[in-house]
Regions:
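Hydrophobic transmembrane alpha-helices and their immediate loop junctions
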Residues: 1-211
Length: 211
């Protein structure tokens, strides 16, 4: 999933990269607002502007490694009426946004792909291909249950209360653990199965729709 294999490939991936990051965080903020938390909106993060969600390290990771993250949308669980349920909704909203984008791109490619390619050529096809790959990559990466990724919030919501203290203690080291796993390549043991499952499902949609 590396994007820096060639300069042209990098340039063609930029629209998908900006959209995937922006929409992912927007969905978090929108879901939080729907369950009662106005924090993201008040801080100007309920936006599709990539600059509102830009994280230098996470973006460089996306470019050089193939997966990464944006600046997390601020969430205040004190506003949640049903904290455990609502944190799952908010945490999975970003992933859902990326999967929705990938699915809609597949639909577009399936029904309008020939016309699109005839108008835009190989670069136009590459833009759509990156839109699918990057959104699936961001979704898969965020499903990994390691703090501070979205998957960890889902795990936290289902943990018995007696384990929450220990899990939240681990969170303060989450970013360090994550970077070590990425640098060592161990992260692929988590990432690859999730991404491959999402990729196979997406390709099945592409091949089966309208057949």
């Amino acid at each position: 999933m590396r994007l820096l294999d060639e300069p042209v490939n990098l340039l063609l991936s930029i629209p998908a990269l900006l959209w995937a990051i922006s929409f992912h965080e927007f969905c978090h903020g929108f879901a939080a607002k729907m369950v009662g938390d106005p924090t993201a909106e008040r801080q100007g993060r309920l936006s599709l502007n990539p600059l509102a969600h830009f994280d230098l390290v996470g973006t460089l990771m996306l470019l050089f490694v193939g997966f990464g993250w944006a600046k997390p949308v601020p969430i205040n669980t004190r506003y949640f009426r049903h904290p455990r349920r609502d944190i799952v909704i908010v945490s999975l909203a970003g992933v859902a946004g990326n999967l929705l984008t990938a699915t809609l791109t597949v639909f577009f490619l399936r029904f309008f792909g020939r016309a699109w390619v005839s108008l835009t050529g190989e670069p136009g096809f590459a833009v759509l291909w990156h839109m699918i790959r990057i959104n699936l990559g961001l979704a898969a990466f965020n499903l990994i249950p390691i703090p501070p990724l979205d998957g960890s919030r889902v795990i936290e919501a289902f943990l018995p209360y007696k384990y929450l203290y220990h899990y939240r203690w681990l969170e303060q080291y989450g970013m360090f653990i994550l970077l070590v796993l990425v640098a060592s390549g161990i992260i692929n043991l988590f990432f690859d199965p999730i991404f491959n499952a999402l990729w196979r499902l997406t390709m099945w949609q592409l091949l089966s729709i309208g057949s």
